[in-house]
Design a protein with these regions (language model features):
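Residues that mark the N-terminal boundary/hinge immediately upstream of a DNA-recognition element
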Residues: 27, 53-56
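N-terminal flexible/basic segments that precede or flank functional cores
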Residues: 1-19, 24
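Short alpha-helical DNA-recognition segment
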Residues: 25-43
Length: 76
């Protein structure tokens, strides 16, 4: 059986992102522009099925002013 623990983390990150985006009334397109990426990629991330790089997680943290990495380390 393949280890998919990253999928569980990715889904938690997606939920946190969606909550913050809702709080900020931020669209996927707006977040993509801030991150320097595409709306399509942000959509994939928000589905919780994207294996995120540290660089991407850092960009998300900076753009949404949330902590992802520290919380995921504490939950591991």
């Amino acid at each position: 059986m393949q280890n998919k623990s990253w999928l569980r983390h990715s889904q938690r990150i997606a939920v946190k992102m969606l909550e913050k985006m809702d709080e900020l009334s931020m669209t996927q397109k707006q977040l993509a522009n801030m991150m320097g990426g595409s709306q399509q990629y942000v959509s994939k991330v928000l589905k919780g099925q994207e294996n995120l790089s540290l660089e991407t997680m850092s960009k998300i943290e900076d753009c949404l002013h949330i902590s992802i990495l520290q919380e995921e380390i504490e939950m591991a």
